[in-house]
Amino acid sequence: MTIQPAVPTSPTNAAPEAARVTPMMEQYLEIKAANPGLLLFYRMGDFYELFFEDAEIASCTLGITLTKRGKHQGADIPMCGVPVERSDDYLHRLIAAGHRVAVCEQMEDPAAARRRGNKSVVRRDVVRLITPGTLTEDTLLDARANNYLLALARARASSGGNRIALAWIDISTAEFIVTECSTGELAATLARINPNEVIVSDALYGDPDMAALLRELPSVTPLTRDVFDGATAERRLCDYFAVATMDGLSAMSWLEATAAAAAVTYVDRTQIGKRPPLSPPSREAAGSTMAIDPATRANLELTRTLAGERRGSLLDAIDRTMTAAGSRLLAQRLAAPLTDIAAIARRLDAVAAFTSDSAARDDIRTILRTAPDMSRALARLSVGRGGPRDLAGLRDGIMAADRTLARLSALPDPPQDIVAAMQALRRPSRELARELGEALAENLPLMKRDGGFAREGYEPTLDEARKLRDDSRLVVAAMQARYTEETGVKTLKIRHNNVLGYFVEVTAQHGDKLTSAPLNATFIHRQTLAGQVRFTTSELGEIEARIANAGDRALGLELEIFDRLAAVVVEAGDDLRAAAHAFAQLDVAASLAKLATDENFTRPEVDASLGFAIEGGRHPVVEQALKRAGQPFIANACDLSPGPGQTSGQIWLLTGPNMAGKSTFLRQNALIALMAQIGSFVPATRARIGMIDRLFSRVGAADDLARGRSTFMVEMVETAVILNQASERALVILDEIGRGTATFDGLSIAWAAIEHLHEANKCRALFATHYHELTALSAKLPRLFNATVRVKEWHGEVVFLHEVLPGAADRSYGIQVAKLAGLPPSVVARAKSVLAKLEAQDRGSTVRALVDDLPLFAVPSRAADESAPPGEAAPLIEALKALHPDEMSPREALEALYALKAKLPKP
């Protein structure tokens, strides 16, 4: 397996011969060479140490001291280290910075190494590769977000172009999903899934056609071809899931199986012998979710604001969940609204049940508050990284399932989704909960190695070992009292550390007393520090051996108990995961009901029509912000439904001044539609939505300097995507198209875009503009409706009323807005003067005349001497018709162009 290094991590020069380095450094270099591209955490006692450039990288990233240890080819070896006890914090920061880490542990204690020979080095080996997509520890994960590893596999489709298969896994929750898409759909699909790490073949990684897309992803790992070998894919999947044939798994295409096998192979290799259980891959049908491209997701601020913050996003505004799993599920649904009308209705039924029965909703939410994150606790236990608190969490989860079932059983007629959740909650064994309850103590340590987690009385043999250990400690306390009396040193203490074991410690001023006769016959000097002197005695050594043996035996017995309980829990994994998912579903339904009640949302109607009728619509995020400020939100209606005798939805052309609320109105209608299709009530008094298959938004733009694109270029690229891809079932919102260039250029582009939306796309759309001349198009385009945002002038000032009404604005009030922004009075006065002169030219009348003169999609006529295409052009025309530009990569398009040129008649 090849892992792409984020930065160089190997020693600068070639590896030295064994004779030129210490045995420890020889071992380090061998392990490092076997794990290229990863920072090597090399265990040295209570620390993980890093060397060479790994140390320099870690020191810089973590802000820890860079020191040195020994020399390598005449130069000092850079070194830094982190305590094992705090390593999770450092690992989290390294992974967040884009690095990958190989954890190398000591596989034996130093005593065992000494028995093998005085020059033997402690055996070490890499036990795990930590990458962004393969995390399980709660300290490394965001509790409210999934952590997906995604594999991409590509193949040429029989109809031309490429097909892409995607397989994504969250090993912390066992989720495993596969799907296929076209090259043109890949960016939108990746934006929806939002993977933390993407694995691709070396060939795909080096493909220039994929370079731009891969650069946008947070972490991309290229792997060798064998990982993406379709010929061995089914065998590898069957091996991972321990099944004889693929019949036991979901039906998958050959390409999907290739991606799925790559994903599980990578998981297997990074976990090194600790194979995490996964759910069988679930196949996501094409078109089952609303397509939303990356630009639209960003513009609408669905899960993150444009500044990258969760606060201020739609997810933040609607998330009332009580559990981490519920929050993750809500984020998944928001990223992938459904197109299945029946499934949407089932979700709405569940929300409605909790909306109408507030007592049941509040009781369920109270129970859910105590429910642990069962999926992630189970995942940690399955790979040997769990602790006693994970076992207790699963025990508490089963008990919470009983309380939840008891409360839901009181519902008179629970809807289908709630009934399904109840069935899942019945699956875990109550006997398992009883066993865990009997085994675990009240106060549990975080780590199993700390011991003390088994309840007294659960295991008699353990109780005996603990008594012997604890009695020995009482002997130490009595010994300290006796030594204090014998020496007359009241500050004498018996202490313990991992280096010296048990020792007698006195302050420096009493050190000479214990080293002088007659006390020096009893007290043997061990260590002198700045303020203390340490001694041992033969009696203390004997007691230490007894305590160590008793303590080791007690801990060993406890670890056996833990491993036995963990194995039973992992065996019941499928039932526990089903219950965990049921908790998440109930949490989302109850939280959306709470949201609907608190914010006065209503149940939307979602059907198969092309209707779009919203009454009293509000922006879910802006309304809450205004409410916190003590201000009301002005609700507005929007109706894009086909008119009488029409078969396609309407386009609203929205005009009005800056700051009047046009962009808010556009966004709120898109968000209402999206919320309806995730199965949520919506901020409106009434809403009827004909199912939307694609959502497009071009609202706001900024320079993309990294890719050499101006604001206007970004705007045009996003607009091109919309005009090329929007279907009749799409909803499009466009704001200020054409504003980033010369006035007449921009007006012409906006004009042509409206015509295209009306005649070619035939979709439902909201189009905001300051080109008031475009309102005259409503006379030519029957499905174009003019709307404006109402304002009022009062004593020379403009008052924004935020009401959307039929009609067209005659002014943009730009100068008044500039005055409100604080432009100097002289600039405002001059602007008014210039505006008056420009308006006197009555440019608008010229444009209105063009509306009458230009037919739709008119193009300049051919020159009089231009002849019609010759008959031999027919093959070219047929070849052009066979092309599908949206499914072609740039390279494929170029090859097609050369092929067409070759078909031209020779002169």
From Swiss-Prot:
Residues involved in ATP binding: 656-663
A Pfam family per the record: MutS_II
GO CC annotation terms, alphabetical: cytosol
UniProt keyword annotation of DNA repair present: yes
PROSITE patterns per record: DNA_MISMATCH_REPAIR_2
Keywords recorded for this protein, A-Z: ATP-binding, DNA damage, DNA repair, DNA-binding, Nucleotide-binding
GO molecular function: ATP binding; ATP-dependent DNA damage sensor activity; damaged DNA binding; mismatched DNA binding
Superkingdom as given in the UniProt entry: Bacteria
GO BP: any one term: mismatch repair
Biological function: This protein is involved in the repair of mismatches in DNA. It is possible that it carries out the mismatch recognition step. This protein has a weak ATPase activity.
Family: Belongs to the DNA mismatch repair MutS family.
HAMAP family hit by this protein: MutS
Protein name (record): DNA mismatch repair protein MutS
Native organism: Nitrobacter hamburgensis (strain DSM 10229 / NCIMB 13809 / X14)
